[in-house]
């Protein structure tokens, strides 16, 4: 058997044994005409996941279960407590990094254990598209979003923009401003020479993975929606509520700039409306807020003036004055369509950091 995979299928899990089985059934059922590997990274599961994976590996080793072109099924464990996580996203990022570090394929895809695929040829179709477009770093499909417990036909295609032409080539501004999709719907050309562990560590989450690889080429679109994205009440996006939701979304693009400064101007342009919305909400509350301990703990670890301010629920009088000033500046930028992002970013983070970024890219 050829031990050099062309495709690495990467799965992360945490106490999802039964859902993992559904996920693996759909993955191992893929009809691929190239060698591929499946790698499962398990973060601290105590629900029998290890035993389930050992049994599945034995079935494959003993030829009780034969999967055409499968080179190996790897099961690896990690403990996200090791990275001193401040939120669920950092735990996921640590798990994603662990599974990514085991990948050997020319291409890779991510899939979460609580999701699955609804066709048996989607990965081959994406792979063919990337082989035909060597200039592209990723091939993007859409996802099919469905609520937990509901039939697939009750779901809907996401994102909800109008359908793109099949094989359309997208450039970074398209992805960041218009068509950004779930990371799991991308097949990505792996860049093994880049040390993602040292660059991102526990911050190697879905969005950072997408943005990192966007730096290496354009994106080709496949007009399919075969990744089933199941929505649960405990999903990360569902647990962010109230002022945490407002502030974290308001500062999201600043987080992206911290790790992917190549697209700093695009991020500021995209995030300006969320920054303005955040300041509007704060102004209505008299610049008082009540963030969860989790969010405050994460902000204390993040460099920059605005993060320091939100690390505590009680702001200093001079910080309130600056917050009001920054709000006026942001509104001014929006009203007159200004693009001197270096100044606004310097106000929000610090001038030294702003001066290190090439804002003309």
Descriptions of predicted regions:
Residues 108:
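Short aromatic/hydrophobic "clamp" motif used to bind/position activated sugar donors
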Residues 141, 160-244:
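Conserved nucleotide-sugar donor-binding catalytic segment
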């Amino acid at each position: 058997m050829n031990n050099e995979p062309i495709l690495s299928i990467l799965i992360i899990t945490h106490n999802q044994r039964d859902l993992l089985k559904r996920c693996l059934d759909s993955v191992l059922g893929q009809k691929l005409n190239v060698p591929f590997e499946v790698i499962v990274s398990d973060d601290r599961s105590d629900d029998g996941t290890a035993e389930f994976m050992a049994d599945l590996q034995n079935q494959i080793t003993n030829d009780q279960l034969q999967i055409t072109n499968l080179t190996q099924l790897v099961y690896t464990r990690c403990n996200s407590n090791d990275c001193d996580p401040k939120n669920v996203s950092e735990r996921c990022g640590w798990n994603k990094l662990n599974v990514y570090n085991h990948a050997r394929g020319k291409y890779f895809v991510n899939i979460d254990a609580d999701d699955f695929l609804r066709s048996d040829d989607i990965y081959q179709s994406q792979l063919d598209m990337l082989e035909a477009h060597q200039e592209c770093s990723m091939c993007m499909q859409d996802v099919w979003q469905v609520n937990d417990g509901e039939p697939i036909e009750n779901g809907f295609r996401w994102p909800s923009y109008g359908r793109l032409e099949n094989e359309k080539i997208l450039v970074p501004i398209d992805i960041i401003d218009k068509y950004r999709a779930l990371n799991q719907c991308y097949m990505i050309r792996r860049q093994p020479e880049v040390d993602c562990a040292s660059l991102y560590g526990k911050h190697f989450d879905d969005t950072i993975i997408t943005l990192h690889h966007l730096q290496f080429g354009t994106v080709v679109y496949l007009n399919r929606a075969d990744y089933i994205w199941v929505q649960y009440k405990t999903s990360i996006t569902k647990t962010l509520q109230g002022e945490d939701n407002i502030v974290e979304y308001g500062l999201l693009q600043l987080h992206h700039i911290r790790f992917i400064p190549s697209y700093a101007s695009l991020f500021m342009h995209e995030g300006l409306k969320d920054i303005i919305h955040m300041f509007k909400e704060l102004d209505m509350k008299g610049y008082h807020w009540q963030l969860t301990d989790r969010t405050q703990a994460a902000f204390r670890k993040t460099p920059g003036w605005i993060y320091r301010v939100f690390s505590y629920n009680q702001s200093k009088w001079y910080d309130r004055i600056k917050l009001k000033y920054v709000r006026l500046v942001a509104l001014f930028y929006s009203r007159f369509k200004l693009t001197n992002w270096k100044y606004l970013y310097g106000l929000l983070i610090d001038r030294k950091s702003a001066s290190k970024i090439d804002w003309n890219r």
